[in-house]
Amino acid sequence: MSEAIRLTQYSHGAGCGCKISPKVLEVILAGSGAQNLDPKLWVGNASRDDAAVYALDEERGVVSTTDFFMPIVDDPFDFGRIAATNAISDIYAMGGDPLMAIAILGWPVNVLAAEVAREVIAGGRKVCEEAGIPLAGGHSIDAPEPIFGLAVTGVVEKRFMKRNDTAEAGCRLYLTKPLGIGILTTAEKKARLRAEDVGVARDWMCTLNRPGARFGRLAGVKAMTDVTGFGLLGHLVEMADGSKLTARVEYAAVPRLASAEYYLEQGCVPGGTLRNFDSYGERIAPLPEVQKLLLCDPQTSGGLLVAVAPEGEAEFLAVAAELGLQLAPIGELVERQSLAVQVL
């Protein structure tokens, strides 16, 4: 049954490319920072961080996050896996460990069979098992387009908690997954994906950001976030602005999927790419079109963006290598200039 279904044809958006643009989100969230007055709320929405953290006691906090979206791939089981991997990532990005998840499902019951939704949930449950947590329940509604995701609860020690706005001048920047996921999934939706590229983006999207829990324990890691729908530049702007610094990025050093630029030449540009640039482009130094299209590419279940102090770099790279990650710096953070990000 599922082989004949193309889930991406039932939605107007795909994955984290469904996100409301940063510019519109600023209007929606204007004034909401007042919620941070609770002293037990260690991390709220003031910094647009990956998750909220609320104190359990003086040493530990509960981490809470939710993430859901429309299909980014056609296969129902893979859609569930990707959505779950993406949602759990926010816990890891805070330096925490996930405890349990609750499913969020919107389904066009008069258009797509219930058995297809069951496959989606099975994919989500599979990833929860890989993360060592239960899929403990959920909520579903009849919706015009398929939607799936998780609300995830985790725990973090305060001394290990990582934010996206605490980087320091001199920190080196690292990215744990290549860019181009939005580009390749757009090629798939347009039926232009070459045979040798089938499954490439999917496999990255289904890779848990579990290393974040280890990175959180490193004193040299000063800030961390995951790269999702706002693209690398969007999350760099958040980190740089929040930390009152400027990020300098070496374009040639940024990891990208091998065929990403080929598909850009074929016109496989996600709709969210230009919306992203329109939202934060004025805070970035001018850059060539191809760089803009790659660096603003909306990532679904993208990698961790990590700011590492020079004195902690050797330990960080050793831990990364132990976890199977061969990383190289993509740039650094310097004292604040007129712009948030410069691409070299």
UniProtKB/Swiss-Prot annotation:
<keyword id="KW-0479">Metal-binding</keyword>
<protein>
    <recommendedName>
        <fullName>Selenide, water dikinase</fullName>
        <ecNumber>2.7.9.3</ecNumber>
    </recommendedName>
</protein>
<dbReference type="InterPro" id="IPR004536">
    <property type="entry name" value="SPS/SelD"/>
</dbReference>
<dbReference type="GO" id="GO:0016260">
    <property type="term" value="P:selenocysteine biosynthetic process"/>
</dbReference>
<keyword id="KW-0460">Magnesium</keyword>
<feature type="binding site" description="in other chain">
    <location>
        <begin position="47"/>
        <end position="49"/>
    </location>
    <ligand>
        <name>ATP</name>
    </ligand>
</feature>
<feature type="binding site" description="in other chain">
    <location>
        <position position="90"/>
    </location>
    <ligand>
        <name>ATP</name>
    </ligand>
</feature>
<dbReference type="GO" id="GO:0070329">
    <property type="term" value="P:tRNA seleno-modification"/>
</dbReference>
<dbReference type="InterPro" id="IPR010918">
    <property type="entry name" value="PurM-like_C_dom"/>
</dbReference>
<keyword id="KW-0067">ATP-binding</keyword>
<keyword id="KW-0418">Kinase</keyword>
<feature type="site" description="Important for catalytic activity">
    <location>
        <position position="19"/>
    </location>
</feature>
<comment type="similarity">
    <text>Belongs to the selenophosphate synthase 1 family. Class I subfamily.</text>
</comment>
<dbReference type="GO" id="GO:0005524">
    <property type="term" value="F:ATP binding"/>
</dbReference>
<feature type="binding site" description="in other chain">
    <location>
        <position position="67"/>
    </location>
    <ligand>
        <name>ATP</name>
    </ligand>
</feature>
<dbReference type="InterPro" id="IPR016188">
    <property type="entry name" value="PurM-like_N"/>
</dbReference>
<comment type="function">
    <text>Synthesizes selenophosphate from selenide and ATP.</text>
</comment>
<comment type="subunit">
    <text>Homodimer.</text>
</comment>
<dbReference type="GO" id="GO:0005737">
    <property type="term" value="C:cytoplasm"/>
</dbReference>
<keyword id="KW-0808">Transferase</keyword>
<feature type="binding site">
    <location>
        <begin position="138"/>
        <end position="140"/>
    </location>
    <ligand>
        <name>ATP</name>
    </ligand>
</feature>
<feature type="binding site">
    <location>
        <position position="226"/>
    </location>
    <ligand>
        <name>Mg(2+)</name>
    </ligand>
</feature>
<dbReference type="Pfam" id="PF02769">
    <property type="entry name" value="AIRS_C"/>
</dbReference>
<dbReference type="GO" id="GO:0004756">
    <property type="term" value="F:selenide, water dikinase activity"/>
</dbReference>
<dbReference type="InterPro" id="IPR036676">
    <property type="entry name" value="PurM-like_C_sf"/>
</dbReference>
<feature type="binding site">
    <location>
        <position position="90"/>
    </location>
    <ligand>
        <name>Mg(2+)</name>
    </ligand>
</feature>
<dbReference type="InterPro" id="IPR023061">
    <property type="entry name" value="SelD_I"/>
</dbReference>
<dbReference type="GO" id="GO:0000287">
    <property type="term" value="F:magnesium ion binding"/>
</dbReference>
<feature type="binding site" description="in other chain">
    <location>
        <position position="19"/>
    </location>
    <ligand>
        <name>ATP</name>
    </ligand>
</feature>
<feature type="binding site">
    <location>
        <position position="50"/>
    </location>
    <ligand>
        <name>Mg(2+)</name>
    </ligand>
</feature>
<dbReference type="InterPro" id="IPR036921">
    <property type="entry name" value="PurM-like_N_sf"/>
</dbReference>
<dbReference type="Pfam" id="PF00586">
    <property type="entry name" value="AIRS"/>
</dbReference>
<feature type="active site">
    <location>
        <position position="16"/>
    </location>
</feature>
<keyword id="KW-0547">Nucleotide-binding</keyword>
<keyword id="KW-0711">Selenium</keyword>
